[in-house]
Amino acid sequence: AMSSMKVAQAEYGMGMGYGISRLHGALCSGTIDGKDANGTAYFQKVCVQAPSPPWFWGMLHLDDGSYIDWFLPHVSPTITAKDSRPWKNRDITHLPLSMGGLFHDVSRNRSEKFSEVRVERTCDEGGLPTFHVHMWNGITEIRIEARAVTRAHWTFDQPTRGGMKSHLTYNEYPLDVTRLEIDDEKGVRNRSDWGVIRGNAEHSWGLLH
């Protein structure tokens, strides 16, 4: 399931919509600092023909082959942001436009979707966020705390009407998972039930149109 390509697309009308092709966990091998390495990697190709509001997205790869994915496009005061400076005073709340989560659970031999997803953030002294993720679907409830270890970001300034520009800052954060709790009909699992967990999160602000 991890190395099978999944395709999703949606059309909103008036020629606007998106398409995405994803490999949730492609098996990879290579060298790092001259040493052989094996693992999994997430790949995606996204085509968007629509205004891009802010979003939260994250992906965790667990060492047994399981993965957890969440996505939360939203409206917030940061939609008016015009630069890449993090943790603006207006970054205080957000209103989800949609919510989606996925847990491919190897030990339970199933994949579960989640339509209830909450994402909150706290910030350390260096300006890096910790993401607090809560997902549930009536069968399984997942709680995650994942600390960003660094930040990479890209900015887009696109000319629009009247000589003005629309702006989008897109952030990537490699994650250190400090808490993981999965509660389902068979019991509770936590961070100690897995060894290595690797992940990445995205957070954006502004509105590209």
Which residues are covered by each model-predicted region?
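Structured soluble/peripheral alpha/beta segments that form catalytic or ligand/cofactor-binding pockets
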Residues: 1-209
